[in-house]
Design a protein with these regions (language model features):
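Short loop segments at secondary-structure junctions
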Residues: 25, 114, 170-174
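Conserved active-site "lid/cap" helical segment
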Residues: 1-34, 211, 215-223
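Conserved small-residue
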Residues: 17, 36, 80, 100, ...
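Conserved catalytic cysteine-centered active-site region
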Residues: 1-15, 33, 43-106, 115, ...
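Condensing-enzyme catalytic core mediating Claisen C-C bond formation in acyl metabolism
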Residues: 147-221, 227-228
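Short beta-strand-to-turn element immediately C-terminal to the catalytic PLP-Schiff-base lysine
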Residues: 142, 167-171, 217, 239, ...
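Beta-strand segments within the central parallel beta-sheet cores of soluble alpha/beta enzyme folds
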Residues: 31-38, 91-95, 116-124, 181-189, ...
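Acyl-CoA/ACP chain-elongation machinery
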Residues: 115-138, 143-156, 189-203, 231-240, ...
Length: 261
């Protein structure tokens, strides 16, 4: 019943959140100090497409009364908050491909500022629909060879996928005190805009360069401290070129492993 009333994007989010919370163990904090900061680029597009077809073929009275809450971008984060009773800030970040990373950074800030003791954060997406695929294909963002090859000389686009990833962030001292299984520590985050184009990065990757520099400054680290770079790596000609230039600008000629998942 719940599944029928939630878009696949929300279903992915709840499944991933369940796994993350199970791994973290019970959060022994005041619910008003547990937040949910979530990211998505599009939200419930699949439901919207399906209901548009229903409207056209069967009439307006057959459109689901759950359409609006199912298609809203904040549905996934809200669903997590409601399922677990988290009463802290429940906010959604919708910044395209950067949404989940922005959400994690914002979540870490809430803890650093003392507003929250824990925040469930991450992102979910389920936009591999017929209309979205057509749109991405017509803007030549998808690979014509059906192979995603980030940073390869023959790259020609990406392949659409769906899924979710969720983390449980806590204050370090509180996580240690309760014996939590700690997998990583967030030491810095940053965001900015290159103010260039809605789908293309600024030439030379100057926006990405500045963002990485700001993140290093926030963390109190030097570029020489970084041992791995998790790149955007969309396998598109424009992005990968600009991103490679940005990485070189920040890290120089150092041989730092670069991955793109």
């Amino acid at each position: 019943k719940d599944a029928r009333r939630s878009d696949r994007c929300e279903q992915f989010a709840l499944a991933a959140a369940g796994e993350a919370i199970a791994q973290s163990g019970t959060l022994p904090y005041d619910p008003s100090r547990i937040g949910t900061i979530f990211g998505t680029g599009i939200g419930g597009l699949r439901t919207l497409e399906e209901q548009v077809i229903v409207r056209v073929e069967k009439g307006e009275r057959r459109v689901s009364p759950f359409l609006v809450p199912m298609m809203m971008s904040n549905a996934s984060g809200a669903a997590i908050s409601m399922r677990y009773g988290f009463q802290g800030p429940a906010e959604t970040v919708c910044t395209a491909c950067a949404a989940s990373t922005h959400a994690i950074g914002n979540a870490a800030r809430l803890i650093a500022w003392g507003r929250c003791d824990a925040v469930v954060t991450g992102g979910s997406e389920s936009a591999a629909t017929i209309t979205a695929l057509a749109g991405f294909a017509n803007m030549t963002a998808l690979s014509s060879t059906l192979v995603s090859k980030p940073f390869d000389a023959t790259r020609d686009g990406f392949i659409m996928g769906e899924g979710a990833a969720v983390f449980v962030l806590e204050r370090l001292d509180m996580a240690v005190a309760r014996g939590a299984h700690i997998v990583a520590e967030i030491v810095g985050a940053a965001s900015n805009a290159d103010a260039h184009h809605i789908t293309a990065p600024s030439p030379g990757g100057v926006g990405a360069t500045r963002c990485m520099q700001l993140a290093l400054e926030d963390a109190g680290l030097q570029s020489s401290d970084i041992k791995q770079i998790n790149a955007h790596g969309t396998s598109t000609p424009l992005n990968d070129s600009a991103e490679a230039q940005a990485i070189t600008a920040v890290f120089g000629d150092r041989s730092v492993p670069v991955v793109s998942i």
